[in-house]
Amino acid sequence: MKFEKNTDIFILPDFIRIQLESFHRFIEKGLLEEFQRFPVIRDSSGELSYFLNGKRYKLQEPSFNEQEAIYQASTYSSELYVPAQITHTKSEKTKSEIILIGNIPIMTARGNFIINGASRVIVNQILRSPGLYYGSELDAQANITYSCTFISEWGGRLKLEMDNKRRIWVRLSKKRKIPVLLLLLAMGLNWKDLEKLISRPSLLLSYLSKEKRTPYSPEEAIIELYRHSCSVSGEISFSENIRKELYHKFFKIRCEIGSIGRLNINKKLNLDIPEEERFLVPQDLIAAINSLIEKSFKIVNLDDIDHLKNRRVHLIADMLQSQVRIALNRLKRMIAEVMRGINKRKNLPNPQSLVTPKPLVATFQEFFGSHPLCQFMDQTNPLAEITHKRRISSLGPGGLTQKTATFNVRDIHPSHYGKICPIETPEGQNAGLVSSLAILANINQNGFIESPFLKLHKNEYKQLTGSEHLCSEQEEYYRITTGEHSRETAEKKGKPTPIRYRQEFSATAFHFLHFRDILPIQYFSIATSLIPFLEHDDANRALMGSNMQRQAVPLLRPEKPIVGTGLEGQVALDSAALVLSKIEGKVDFVDGRNINIRSNIVINEFFSFQLINYERSNQNTCLHQKPIVKKDDYVKKGELLADASSTLGGEISLGNNILVAYMPWEGYNFEDAVLINERLIYEDIYTSIHIEKYEIEVNMTSLGPEKITKKIPHLSEYLLRNLDVNGLILLGSWVKTGDVLVGKLTPREPGESLRLPEGRLLHAIFGIKASSFFETCLKVAPGAEGRVIDVRWVESANKLTQKYIKTVNIYILQKRKIQVGDKIAGRHGNKGVISRILPREDMPYIQDGTPIDMVLSPLGVPSRMNLGQIFECLLGLAGESLKKHYRIMPFDERHEREASRKLAFSELYQAKKFTGHSWLFEPDTPGKSQLFDGRTGQTFENAITVGKAYILKLIHQVDDKIHARSTGPYSMVTQQPLGGKARRGGQRMGEMEVWALEGFGAAYTLQELLTRKSDDMKGRNEALGAIVTGNLIPKPNTTPESFKLLMRELRCLCLNIHHCSLFQENLSMKNIEF
């Protein structure tokens, strides 16, 4: 970040630099560190040794680019080569070779990975930082017990507790603990030393029984510690193997604190142990015990576990480095096993023959395929991409879980100020556990989050002396004020300046201050910073607005927002979705796929830019780049050449500016329902493009290969009409539900055809054997239709199984216009579902005759307290009339009271003067106007708020959710229809739905839903037969299957319950068996 002194001019940082810098650190340092740990491997006799020279490792350039990796459904990776040497120590013979260790996935310039053709992102994880932490808790008798916890680099914990009798224990698990004296003696200390080093040594002996008044010897201590930590019973004698096993199972997991933990412990305990010592040493434990004793006798401040100074971010470099460590350990074991079987009398083998790429390839496949923090990239729009890369999660291995996370962990902490956004977090179970980095926040190499501040100079004439990045711990020592305060304003007001100091908010004189903030929005995430008039919105609604902007689908004709915050260009630029010129020159050629530029510096040098053309994203939205330059245009380096699918003119454009009115209309906008004008459909204002991928594999079965062919038996010619002679769909074909995309036949077992009724009939009448293949064609899914835009044959080799897999991928493009049931939203958390589409002539219209585009409910504003939408729509109306765009930083009222209201009204007044339309600003009802009813031509009774709002179309669309079924699968246990569209489920009546029908007295409807349409097996067969034959549907008279299930479960509890039928004629009863 760059600043000019004595000014507020600065350059925003690259929003995805954290990902890129972290991966660069992994390549430059992480790999080297892991290779340096790799030992020289020797065989059991010590004659052969195998050595990897990790300092000279090399990464080859990927064999194909990112686009080819996506097209071929392969991984964008680089081969890792390391010099290796095998030596026979007796004969001193050596063989050296540069060997292939495996492939490492490479991060793209956009900060993501391409794994098997799909874009993936590694989410940063925030965990407790290694080190020492003091705390207190209540025991079973409600007494306060003090504890100190050592957290290792691997997440293991070593907890020391002091109970109410002043005895100190080492906690092994919830139910097991041992005296701390055992641990100290097992670490090599003797009792004489402990008497001198511990401040109150009598506390260590308080646990001993009367019979044993002398402490254990070191060997006895090791045996006792081994017995308790490894849960071993019986007689154990001391041996060196026990010491080694104790080291691996206890000390390595719980006591390896790393360099960060060493710094933390040295600082808290005032020790000067070298940073290279990465394990706990006896001095650490002794100092911690003395400190714990001291804290138990005094009232002192304990550590706040939720403070960011006690939490560290695990970046991409840390996660990938740990995977390389796992892979190299596997490789080490593999080499050692191979070396056991080498005949030493023969020639030395080549180093490559002892190594295979499987350990590294398998480890990364497992990591990218199943690790919870390695996720499919959210590619709904560029904002969703960039937000996903800046996400921080407390979940995952070594972290919290949704069930165990308490309210304190999820809550906003004062140390988050300027580092983690207090607004943007998911709704639901992950609230507070998944967060987003603040807009200017950075993560340093140790994993601590920093925020930049402008340093104030004590000299009266020099206010600023540059900027500094401070982490949470450093911040506590400085007095920091907000960005709008300066020496001049403080002197004019003559009042103390509000500051924050040591997590408290207070006020002091300006000359005592050290730093001030840079931006009023530096505390918020990118998505939250894109909300204009953010300060007028309730935090809950701002959260929804932040999340819903990421769900906006790219539109066919997007518009820039009339009212924005000024960050729209930076977000589009840093998302890497735009195409920028890398050289200065003249545009030589441009079309929809390529832009060629002739260099202005080097003669006859051309630079070609390949554009993304109707590619599918992970969320089935459309990735597309549109050139904005023309032939013979002169461009400079860094100038925009092409827009992406959700950008316009280099700014992020997620929606459209439309004319809205806040008024009720015949109940069609009750609650969150929305009424829209048909203009939005006919003019493609909210039309979006979606691309669906259909995939089918062609396998070699045990009975022979599967066939791709057009000749499919038992299917009509109509369903096969779009196939070419080879059985693949023709490019450009329009397909509907059920149409065949790929004709495929799979071999059937010999004799299986004769077991089928149709096979036996053909054989009996004509003597013809039925086909030895059955149809397994790829068909268009129910409810889908569209145009085929691509057909791809993909041949991929599995490096682990050495098998080649042939796959056919079909891409179908669909244009979706807005319709009833689609979800729309603004940027202020104001969301709704389309309830009705009205003709233009029936919509209310303003005084110049323009019909309203969207009618929103006015009751959705006051109770939700998101007044920012009102300011936005009024200022948008003024901007539309004045042909202006506004870029307003949130918190504009820091300069003046009612600044937002004054700005909106003054701009409406200017629009009234500019256009001559008096209705734009009426002094009696400012911001409101008289509307006319499109059906009658009469005015509405009251003035109505009208304006231009920026409305988004969200990815929650009715085409993806609507579902109907006539027949389908049933659950084997309850015999009720399955749930969900994906499983072809049916409508399921829950308890509350039954109550609703009971309330209306719909007895017959209720009976039908609870019997025939649910789990009455006999009744539904009878109903189907009656429908087919055209007879009346009989009344259900059999027992539903769910009732039978209840009876069986009660019988399992030894309750003898019978189901009886009562006859109306003679009131006789009959037991019904089932």
UniProtKB/Swiss-Prot annotation:
The GO annotation for biological process reads: DNA-templated transcription
Please tell me whether the keyword Transmembrane is annotated for this protein.
Answer: no
Reactions it catalyzes? RNA(n) + a ribonucleoside 5'-triphosphate = RNA(n+1) + diphosphate
Give compartment(s). Answer: Plastid, Chloroplast
GO cellular component entries: chloroplast; DNA-directed RNA polymerase complex; mitochondrion
EC annotation from Swiss-Prot or TrEMBL: 2.7.7.6
The protein's UniProt keywords, in alphabetical order, are:
Chloroplast, DNA-directed RNA polymerase, Nucleotidyltransferase, Plastid, Transcription, Transferase
Q: Enumerate the GO terms in the molecular function aspect.
A: DNA binding; DNA-directed RNA polymerase activity; ribonucleoside binding
Q: What does this protein do?
A: DNA-dependent RNA polymerase catalyzes the transcription of DNA into RNA using the four ribonucleoside triphosphates as substrates.
Q: What class of enzyme is it?
A: transferase
Is Hydrolase a UniProt keyword of this protein? no
Protein family:
Belongs to the RNA polymerase beta chain family.
Q: Which HAMAP family match?
A: RNApol_bact_RpoB
Q: How does it assemble?
A: In plastids the minimal PEP RNA polymerase catalytic core is composed of four subunits: alpha, beta, beta', and beta''. When a (nuclear-encoded) sigma factor is associated with the core the holoenzyme is formed, which can initiate transcription.
Q: Which Pfam families match?
A: RNA_pol_Rpb2_1, RNA_pol_Rpb2_2, RNA_pol_Rpb2_3, RNA_pol_Rpb2_6, RNA_pol_Rpb2_7
Q: Which organism is it from?
A: Chara vulgaris
CDD domains (alphabetical): RNA_pol_B_RPB2 (cd00653)
Q: What is this protein called?
A: DNA-directed RNA polymerase subunit beta
